[in-house]
Amino acid sequence: VSDSATNAEIQHKTFHLKLLRDFIHQAQQQPPFIDDQCPQEDLEFLQALEALPAAQSQEDFAHRGQQLMCRVVAAYPQLMPLLHRDLLWFFGGDCLHYMPDEEIARFQELDERRHQALAEGREFSYERERANLLGLH
């Protein structure tokens, strides 16, 4: 594995962990989590969400991420505008049920470009390619 491939993979994971931390930070400031009488179930969900970035090297990281993202969709719809769509794609699995086909196709294209660059040993900036593909310049 080339240095550029390793760097691209690290950059890809780091980008998504940043989005995850950003979402967690924003969620912490929203009801029901800021309520004085926040139900225990909601506090436990928030604690599980807060613990997720630290679990990135664990085998069940993707599965835990899927479960938590799906729980956001089902139990905390008010948080959906804060949830980066990239995280649904990143964790995959059942999360994909909440993405329209066109959105999935864009993320597939982005992954294909990343894998092609890695296969060819080319440098690849996930953030730059994502911005170009999603029209975020």
List the model feature ranges, each with a label.
Residues 16-20, 42-45, 62-66, 89, ...:
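Short amphipathic alpha-helical segments that mediate assembly, nucleic-acid/protein binding
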Residues 29, 33, 55-58, 101, ...:
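Intrinsically disordered or highly flexible coil/loop and linker segments, enriched in small
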Residues 2-51:
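Short terminal alpha-helical segments
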Residues 60-118:
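Amphipathic protein-protein interaction modules
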Residues 47-64:
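N-terminal hydrophobic signal/anchor transmembrane helix of membrane proteins
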Residues 20-28, 65-66, 71-73, 127:
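Generic hydrophobic, helix-prone segments enriched in Leu/Val/Ile
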Residues 109, 113-137:
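Alpha-helical oligomerization segments
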